[in-house]
Amino acid sequence: GKEKENPYDLELYERKMTAIASVLAMDTDVLILDEPTIAQDWKGRQIIGSIIRSLSGRGKLVIAILHDMDFVAENFERVIIMAHGQVLADGTAKEVFAQEEVLKKARLQKPYVMQLSEALGYEKSYLTVEELLKDRMSLCAAIKL
């Protein structure tokens, strides 16, 4: 363990996790995260996503300020895009990410899976790898019948 280390001596990803853990210990009804995925590897992102889903499932409000649209698509039902203090879009991830001009104004990109599904010419737009694989596998299974 690192329980005896000064938090300032920890790596950035460890400090972020420590900060999240300390806020979780307070058991608040609202959690605000500012760029929680910065300095996180895949496992850290998965842990943070799991925490967010768990809190949401318990009726807690999780607000996150993010530029990582893949993480947003994987973990949040409602998305609000802001730029220069103005709300540009508010809706489900699919609704918001379908608004090209809004994304351009906010200097954001669609999630990579959404970009890929559009580049491949799929009629349906996918937000997550899991969603794409599930749908494509069911199409393959239907063709085999």
PLM region descriptions:
Residues 72-74:
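A short, surface-exposed alpha-helical micro-motif characterized by mixed small hydrophobic
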Residues 31-34:
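Catalytic Walker B motif of ABC-type/P-loop ATPase nucleotide-binding domains
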Residues 90-91:
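ABC ATPase "signature
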Residues 103-145:
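ABC ATPase nucleotide-binding domains
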Residues 66-67:
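H-loop/switch region of ABC-family ATPase nucleotide-binding domains
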Residues 1-8:
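Conserved ABC nucleotide-binding domain
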Residues 84-85:
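Conserved ABC ATPase "signature" C-loop
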